[in-house]
Amino acid sequence: PPDSSVNTSPEVVAAVIRLLKKAGAGRIILAEASAIGCDTMACLESSGIRKAAEDAGVDEIRDIKSDTDLVKKQIANPTSDITQVDLPRFLLEADHLVNVPIFKSHVSMVFSCALKNLKGVVQDIHHYVMHCTNLAAAMMDLGDIVRPTLTVVDMIRPMEGFGPHSGTPVEFGCVVAGQDMV
């Protein structure tokens, strides 16, 4: 549900799309790969993100898990067992990449934010391998090859406790943005 703080709030996603359009962005693609074993489009629907994005005027919504036009990218100096990752060509060819995570607690990482949200650009096999290795190091390795132009962090209702799926939403009431995701 949209108020569970499991996903970025639909309102923040819609606001980012509207602001990008106002700033003169051309084609805006909302792209996501949901958690392992989950149907990305069903998750976007049940979270309210799909409708909010469409209402805000997004040009396309893509499920990265079903993308077949992938480019194998080597990680130059990996700190984890991840030495390469397959990324969607459209993502690598985009003029800009805007990362829009929600801030929440995470049992495997203490908290989840900009770096952890980058897992939304890889397919299930990479999700799985990252969880089988040092997850924090794998996220840093992915961050070396996927560099968002802008990160907008939803801290309106972040999650505390047993996240990323079973925590408790808390009212915080702000959005934080910057060019350096770390």
Residues covered by each model-derived region:
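N-terminal and secondary-structure boundary signal
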Residues: P1-V182
